[in-house]
Amino acid sequence: MENFPIINLENLCGAERDATMEMIKDACENWGFFELVNHGIPHEVMDTVEKFTKGHYKKCMEQRFKELVASKGLEAVQAEVTDLDWESTFFLRHLPVSNISEVPDLDDEYREVMRDFAKRLEKLAEELLDLLCENLGLEKGYLKKAFYGSKGPNFGTKVSNYPPCPKPDLIKGLRAHTDAGGIILLFQDDKVSGLQLLKDDQWIDVPPMRHSIVINLGDQLEVITNGKYKSVPHRVIAQTDGTRMSLASFYNPASDAVIYPAPALVERDAEENKQIYPKFVFDDYMKLYARLKFQAKEPRFEAMKAMEADVKIDPVATV
């Protein structure tokens, strides 16, 4: 079994830069996931985020989740549950307009901590997009421009806790899916595991590692790279012991961004691989995804092809 790709970003600054870029390229082409260490976000910042997130769950959300479980009779289920997930969540929006001040039940200090963390993640996401551009042979900034639309990217964090589950064989923490958006940055619990990705028809654990950031690619990067990079199905397995913390931050296109394969990549691959993905408005894709999240992505792309004739390409996103 191949080892899950773990990439030390500090190595981009020295003699190992070429080898590190090759590791990122291989991870994007063959895994759709990789794990970053020495990514520039201070450990003390991450420790503070973890402390406040776990404290907020205990104080404000744990009892609500127990009441929800009791109301649905989930502790006594005898057959597989396919229409819900064993997770307690809330969502913070950062861009284009933050909602952090409006989310109820957050301590003011937690709000400030998350604002700071989000700015650091945004910077890291944009650095990573430029590394992907370099590996793809696209001009620097191409992917950020492709996501920009009229108001800039959508960026937000799904804060999740996965409590102990009495029937993990029957209830998933989070059912298998690909992510709809662009690039996802995950700060996950380093003590309680559960995240798995599908590779070569096998479910593989994403190793919990202290102070790492797990990266995965969404459907939009698969489209823009014309399939050179793939979004990969992943899931969360519920555990009988321990509550797993997960902060998944989604750097996504603007709602009105027009997404389509990069012309330079289509031309380069023309002999063996014509343009196989549609062009569409990201918001249209998200409306479809909301209904079909836990189904295969290919029918979503096919549905977008049916709408393609009405989509105008925004010249800002061309090479």
From Swiss-Prot:
Keywords associated with the record: Ethylene biosynthesis, Iron, Metal-binding, Oxidoreductase, Vitamin C
Catalytic activity: 1-aminocyclopropane-1-carboxylate + L-ascorbate + O2 = ethene + L-dehydroascorbate + hydrogen cyanide + CO2 + 2 H2O
Domain Fe2OG dioxygenase: 153-253
One example of a Gene Ontology biological process annotation: coumarin biosynthetic process
Cofactor annotation: Fe cation
Alphabetical list of Pfam families matching this protein: 2OG-FeII_Oxy (PF03171), DIOX_N (PF14226)
InterPro entries: DIOX_N, IPNS-like_FE2OG_OXY, IPNS-like_sf, Oxoglu/Fe-dep_dioxygenase_dom, Plant_2OG-oxidoreductases
Domain of life per record: Eukaryota
Signal peptide: none
This enzyme's EC code(s): 1.14.17.4
Pathway(s) annotated for this protein in UniProt: Alkene biosynthesis; ethylene biosynthesis via S-adenosyl-L-methionine; ethylene from S-adenosyl-L-methionine: step 2/2
Molecular functions (GO terms): 1-aminocyclopropane-1-carboxylate oxidase activity; 2-oxoglutarate-dependent dioxygenase activity; L-ascorbic acid binding; metal ion binding
Protein residues bound to Fe cation: 177, 179, 234
Similarity comment text for this entry: Belongs to the iron/ascorbate-dependent oxidoreductase family.
PANTHER family cross-referenced by the UniProt entry: OXOGLUTARATE/IRON-DEPENDENT DIOXYGENASE
Full protein name: 1-aminocyclopropane-1-carboxylate oxidase 4
Protein's organism: Petunia hybrida
Gene from which this protein is expressed: ACO4
